[in-house]
């Protein structure tokens, strides 16, 4: 059962109970009162679709019996059903009270009294409510005068008792209602029809202020005396300021040609004032005069809140929202709201909107009418009399509100019938001093200039018109960043936002500032976007009504007249908003780049052809609303391929590993282009790239501005940049980078060949992906240990130990590392360094600071085997092959002697190694601290010695280790002093002299 049917069934029971309890029945008016007293609400006529109580009860023939009386009234009695027959019989047996009978008889006699009311000379005025009822009755269909009583009683449930309003006959009623009722004589008799008002026939537009534009009401002539000396007043003749008016009174014309000019002007002013008084009085007597002044003030207040105009269909709703009360035009005597607004033309002005096909209501005082030239004067020729020279001059000189006020007493609809339009215009064109065409051109020019100035004025100077946001610069490979996953389409198509002080906090600050700025109503209205600016690709802002925040958006497409689809560049999603909620974006809010980064999960592809809904849902649950750790892999077609890891628990959870375990994805060792972003990539369409060519070179060479890693507790740390004091190394950075890239292509191949020949290096070869256990870390996933990324290798721009105390390597070390390991630094850097930089003799061991303790001990143990000389020879040869091409490009002239000394030491060390094959004991014996101090102070101590053992011969390195930024990378004492980057003295000076 619907809600309407439930209300109707409940209403039937309530009306039956009310009528059964009354023995003599109730009139429709009494039924309304009794229902209000019993229920507390009025009858739900509008909800059920009825116009009157009589129409409601006629639709209930099984509940209500309509009994007409001889006096024209209607009595409603209940029709009992099976359950209420007993109650009805008991009520019928009740005795009738004499007091009730006398009161009812007195009431009926007072209503239907045939006594003629006393009235004075002024005829009675038909109340507005009665006039509204007559309009409602005749709006359906015309009614014969002989059937008027029956039709009125059928419609409203009561007879039309005109005598209680002061009328003596129905003829007087029709005469008083002649402005709304027209009587036509037909063969069947007098036919009453509803007269169309002048406001419906032709739209009236009047200047605000002194002009009252109520239609002139036809009064009875000769039926009664008004008590005013002027009995016949007509305004059919034109009246001018500069000419003596024609006499409008019913008396003989008095010649005015012999009077002086002063008396003529004073007489003209008096007549003009008298005419204005007549018009204002007639306007107050008209339909608008029946409206309460307080109510008119309220209506004007509501309309004044909309300077751009209020649609007439929304006037009643806005009135109820502002004053919490309903505005009923019928209770005021008007058929609808259009007629009410037309009657209030002294405070309101109506214009027709061709775009919305609706009427717009304006406050006449806030926005006065602008003249539209002779064309509008022809259309509204009743505004101004065109055959007077002074009026034409007023229009041509100053088409403003003041000029309209000066001609306020000229010919209007009061005295200008439509049939005289052509005659008036012909008179105007016959005047030789009136120029029409130049006036039209001038007005059109003013209109175009006005529209242009308004268009420029509506756009704030700091509003964004054709500007685009910039994207964030690309991240470096293997960089660890904190991210929020903002919007997910699939694991291969989602958007992330970096969580850092430079991004997320700046975005929050900007949104707070935008909310503070645009929440001001004046600012919000100032930055409203016109219709012609709402185009795809335009950058603007919008407020979401749910959370009251303002967001930067880019218009994607226009859905209709009221809605557009927008892209949120800071969050990645697409939504639908209203055109009216769009605002211009201030230029100061475009400095922050678009924060949403299009991403794809690295090294995964769907198990099926497309991602399933379960896979997408599982990926959404993994992301959640928490910060994640992202490991940058690479960019493909501008899309960031990134590993996502959840470090909130004790164990790190890699998302691609979870998707593979659940069977949603397949892990592969390469990234495929995202199909979703290939079809539609809003950041590429609507934003500009912010990467410079110089920055791209540094990124490709593996020299990031900042690198990140995880410590032993799983926290995200930031590796600090090294202090670069040598300006020469920075100047040679780009010149050496090209050669290093060339060497990086051949270097790994040579290293691989040399390592394959040595059987003891076979354990360092990468494993086959098929042999990898699925329960362990996925294949190729970077090992997030507390190990630095190969920054502690030897620097060519080394300085003496005293000058280098506490300093790390220069940028050339970064470049050399990148040339060795290529793009995937974090995968093979440890293996390559183990292959190239470990020597077999205990004297010549050079430990890297990032090398783990277990591997250092393993290498140290292998150096004491009898096969050490062979390994030493092969490794020295490998080192010579690797390092000579890289060192043939000197970085500075001061390093040439040192490089020559280094080459000589390599040759001597090779010769000494060949000569020392017969003395394995000397090789197996580790170098003592005393020998190292006596031979070379710059030599590196053995891996097994501690820094304390060298306190007598070398400077104390404790402060250097404490101040070094890489001390956390050492896992044992074997690499404690390797942070001080000195040239490795492979052969002691004393042995070289003996040789």
UniProtKB/Swiss-Prot annotation:
Keywords: Cytoplasm, Developmental protein, Differentiation, Phosphoprotein, Repeat, Spermatogenesis. CDD domains: LOTUS_1_TDRD5 (cd09985), LOTUS_2_TDRD5 (cd09975), LOTUS_3_TDRD5 (cd09976), Tudor_TDRD5 (cd20419). This is Tudor domain-containing protein 5. Disulfide bonds: none annotated. Residues 747-781, 857-892, 911-960 are annotated as: Disordered. InterPro entries: LOTUS-like, OST-HTH/LOTUS_dom, SNase_OB-fold_sf, TDRD5_LOTUS_2, Tudor, Tudor_domain_containing. Residues 7-80, 122-197, 291-365 form the HTH OST-type domain. GO terms for biological process: P granule organization; spermatid development; transposable element silencing by piRNA-mediated DNA methylation. The modification Phosphoserine is found at residue 946. SMART domains: TUDOR. Required during spermiogenesis to participate in the repression transposable elements and prevent their mobilization, which is essential for the germline integrity. Probably acts via the piRNA metabolic process, which mediates the repression of transposable elements during meiosis by forming complexes composed of piRNAs and Piwi proteins and govern the methylation and subsequent repression of transposons. Required for chromatoid body (CB) assembly. Residues 911-925 have a biased composition (Polar residues). Residues 932-943 have a biased composition (Low complexity). GO terms for cellular component: chromatoid body; pi-body; synapse. Belongs to the TDRD5 family. Gene3D superfamilies: 2.30.30.140, 2.40.50.90, LOTUS domain-like (3.30.420.610). PROSITE patterns: HTH_OST, TUDOR. PANTHER family: TUDOR DOMAIN CONTAINING PROTEIN (PTHR22948), TUDOR DOMAIN-CONTAINING PROTEIN 5 (PTHR22948:SF19). Its main location: cytoplasm. Residues 533-592 form the Tudor domain. It is found in: Cytoplasm. Pfam families: OST-HTH (PF12872), TUDOR (PF00567).
